[in-house]
Amino acid sequence: ETTSKKLVKVILLDLYVAWSADPDLMIMFSKNNNSYKAKSRYNELHIGKTIIKIVEGLVSNKIIEIKDGFNDRVKGIGFQSRIWASDTLKTKFRKAKFNQFQIQSHSEREPIVLRDENKQPVEYKDTETVSEMREVLSDYNKLLDQTHIDIYDLEKPLLIIGKGKKKMRLQINQQDKFVRRVFNKSNWNKGGRFYGGWWQRCPKDYRKRIMMDGMMTSEIDYSGLHVVLLYSQEGINYWAEINEDPYHLIGINNIDPNIDLRDAAKLLLLTAINADEELKAFQAFRSQAETGSPEKKMTNDQLKSILSALKRKHEPIAHKITSGAGIDLMKIDGQITEQLVKVFTYKYKCPILTVHDSYVVPFGYDRILFREMENAFEAITGTTHPVANHTTEYSDILEQEPNQTEDIHYHYSEPASQRHLKELE
């Protein structure tokens, strides 16, 4: 197979998967030669800059369409080029004798990513530790690939989330399930969180309705994880010794009464733990606030009054706030998540979805998850009895744990969602 033919196939299959998920979906495409390093570990298909000419040829022959991007370095704005299938190509897609479920990620796709200070991926040499992490991720991704993960009551496999400029389309499909670990600042001790899977971008209200192979799910999270981790670094067991809502404040009177003070305090504290200076924390807070919300309009003085109250409330860890401590905490919660992924993949052979400090498992495995979350937290931090909250409630609670000696498929024998069956037709 010639290189050109291979590249055409890659482009058309990518467009087919996008079209199958959402007929209006475009794919980002870089026209920068430097974006294509054929020998990079992050380029599993070894795609070189030749692909730019291939795309230009497909556009000139009206097989695909393109919207050119731009980059205004003065204003700091821009977007990458987008490509999508032409009407002629969409007609061909409708006649295809295969479906999106027969298209899978390349087996050599790199799940361990190391980024530099500019958040760009960098090459690295494998070590025994990295190889072990990769093996875990590879086995975990195989399990996810074999699991049908869906939101049961969607008429179309699509969510519109966010508002204003942050409004985006989130495809709920069986292709966006690949999970990787990302380390930062060219340092294996910085970061290490698990990223990937459409569920990480899915609002909590929709996560409650996730099904795995036709089974309902349950989600459990660590309460105030990063706050608890900071206290544990000071030798304090937060829930055993303090046991207060870490985000509850009183006496803040200079803000819009429509603002939920607890929610604002939570967002500000978490951004301040990640930021290395106050101004960056305030900017990050407003950036993450919803468009048009009163939180979006909060001034630096208003945010400073909340942050000062949080520092007084959390005096033992006040020195860690706006110190850039978040990246080190990401290493710890990445280690906790790795332990949970390993035990569910290898011991229970049961899929688990990760959302940084919360986890989703098939309903009936939630008590196992609760126990394993406690075990993982204690193993990594040395702190016992962390509080974990059930964030999904069901009236039809199962009273009996699954029998782990039985084959996993026995527990996943419920019928898949009706939309899933329609997609397979």
Give the ranges of each region predicted by the language model.
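Short, hydrophobic-biased segments on the C-terminal half of alpha helices
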Residues: 52-56, 341
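Catalytic palm active-site di-aspartate
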Residues: 221-222, 350-362
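A short, conserved structural fragment
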Residues: 55-73, 350-353
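Active-site palm subdomain of RNA-directed nucleic acid polymerases
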Residues: 335-355
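C-terminal polymerase-core module
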Residues: 276-281, 366-425
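Acidic, glycine-rich two-metal-ion catalytic cores of nucleic acid-processing enzymes
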Residues: 80-261, 358, 373
